[in-house]
Structure formats: C-alpha cells, structure tokens
C-alpha cells in the first residue's frame, strides 16, 4: 500500500562529489522492501513533479531509511541543502521490489551495480546475508572519486570494484569481471546505467531468477499517467508496463531496454 507521510531528516552527508546520503525517519519505513523507492516532493512551490529516489538501506527497528541520490538539477540540489529536523513530503514505499524469495541459505547470488544504481542493491545484499546466501557483488564506477558503498556492501558480500579509467580496483567495466566468473549464480540482481542493464539482460536472458531495476522519468508516480512505460518484448504494439507500478524491477528478457 502506498502511503503519504512527512518523513523527518535525521542526517545528511556528501559521500562522493554531488552524491548525498540522507537518512529519513517515519512510520512508513515499516512497509519498505529492498528495491522499492520513494516519490519525494521538492520543498519548492515552483517544482511540481516529485523525484523518485531508491531506498538504499532499511532499519525498521529504528524506523529509519537511507536514500542516496546524485544532484542532477535544481530539485535534487534543494534536497542537498536539507538539515536534520527538516521534513520531506513522501509517497511510498512504491514499486514491486526485488524478489528475494527465490534464493535460500547456502546458494549463491550475483549482485551487479553501476554508479548511482548501486544504492538499492545495498539492502538486497543485507537481506541475502541474513538468509545465509553467499553474495558476490561487482560494482562499476567511472573513477575512484565516484566509488560509493564499497565498505558497507563488503559487510554483506564479497565485493569487486571496477573503474572505467583504472584509477581504483580493476580497470574496465562490470562485464570484464562478470564474463570471467567461475560460478553460476542461483539469482542475479542488477541496477545501473542503460548500457549495463542491456548487457545483463542479454547475458542472463534465459536465467530463471535474474532481475533488473530500471529507471524512467515519472510524473504522477501512481500508474495513472503512463509517462514511465516500457515495452514488453514480443508485444511491442500490444502491452506496456509502468515502471512506477509494475516495476521498477523486471525479469531479464521481459522488457525492451532503450
């Protein structure tokens, strides 16, 4: 069920250039699942559209959730100025979330993340660790300065970092590592740039438990306006799915990635 609540800012800090980590507190946290997102109103009357931001970490005991976002425009720049005690008008938790029920203790999971797509995978890794799943995370970034969440992710998974320019970790893309893995994962969870998702979608198209977290521009965020639709493979003229309502998580081989 989608709720509307004014969440309280507990803390905020810049963790990489233009990338901020914000902790929010409220009753809504009790309903959150890995892979879902919040649709947040910008506290500025001139900004009409809410911003969808993925949930990175969920602490239901403390009623706190962490979001991580990158400044992309005026709206997110305003978010970055908020202080502890400020309120944010949030709709959520929204989206279907990752399916973690398909994997059990003793099995292996592969987590593939790129850039600002890494945050929603942190809660995935945490929940898999709690289940006793052996998780292996491959995280790709542009350069050393852009690397985020390596230390936190390492608490729950074996982590390999790649950078495009080789300034940190292994030089290359996540595909450089994934193509050379010596094990077959029982489940795969991915989030990142379109190019990375296309790679994962193609490589694991026939895998029974491989999932992609997608991003599309949203307007209403409630499934009514169809501004965030994606096309189903093989049914391009017949069926659209809404990222806000039917996603943002889809199985590999299910949708057309533009």
From Swiss-Prot:
Keywords: 2Fe-2S, Electron transport, FAD, Flavoprotein, Iron, Iron-sulfur, Metal-binding, Pyrimidine biosynthesis, Transport
The keyword Electron transport appears for this protein: yes
Pfam families linked to this entry: DHODB_Fe-S_bind, FAD_binding_6, NAD_binding_1
UniProt-recorded Gene Ontology molecular function terms: 2 iron, 2 sulfur cluster binding; electron transfer activity; flavin adenine dinucleotide binding; metal ion binding; oxidoreductase activity
Functional pathway: Pyrimidine metabolism; UMP biosynthesis via de novo pathway; orotate from (S)-dihydroorotate (NAD(+) route): step 1/1
Keyword field contains tRNA-binding: no
Essential cofactor(s): [2Fe-2S] cluster; FAD
GO BP term, example: 'de novo' UMP biosynthetic process
Similarity comment text for this entry: Belongs to the PyrK family.
Quaternary structure and partners: Heterotetramer of 2 PyrK and 2 PyrD type B subunits.
Official protein name in the record: Dihydroorotate dehydrogenase B (NAD(+)), electron transfer subunit
């Amino acid at each position: 069920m989608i709720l509307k609540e004014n969440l309280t800012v507990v803390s905020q800090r810049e963790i990489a250039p233009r990338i901020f980590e914000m902790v929010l507190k409220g009753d809504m946290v009790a309903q959150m699942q890995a892979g879902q997102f919040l649709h947040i109103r910008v506290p500025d009357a001139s900004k009409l559209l809410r911003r969808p931001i993925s949930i990175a970490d969920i602490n239901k005991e403390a009623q706190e959730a962490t979001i991580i976002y990158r400044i992309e425009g005026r709206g997110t720049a305003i978010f970055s100025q908020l202080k502890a005690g400020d309120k944010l008008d949030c709709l959520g938790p929204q989206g279907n979330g990752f399916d973690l029920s398909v994997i059990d203790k003793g099995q292996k999971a592969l987590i593939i993340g790129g850039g600002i797509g890494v945050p929603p995978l942190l809660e995935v890794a945490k929940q898999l660790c709690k289940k006793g799943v052996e998780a292996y995370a491959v995280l790709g970034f542009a350069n050393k300065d852009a690397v985020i969440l390596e230390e936190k992710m390492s608490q729950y998974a074996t982590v390999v970092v790649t950078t495009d320019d080789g300034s940190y970790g292994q030089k290359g893309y996540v595909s450089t590592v994934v193509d050379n893995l010596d094990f077959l994962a029982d489940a795969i969870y991915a989030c990142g740039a379109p190019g990375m998702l296309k790679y994962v979608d193609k490589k694991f198209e026939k895998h029974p438990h491989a999932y992609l977290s997608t991003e599309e521009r949203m307007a209403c965020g409630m499934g009514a306006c169809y501004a965030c639709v994606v096309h189903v493979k093989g049914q391009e003229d017949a069926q659209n799915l809404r990222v806000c309502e039917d996603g943002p998580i889809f199985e590999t081989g299910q949708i057309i990635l533009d």
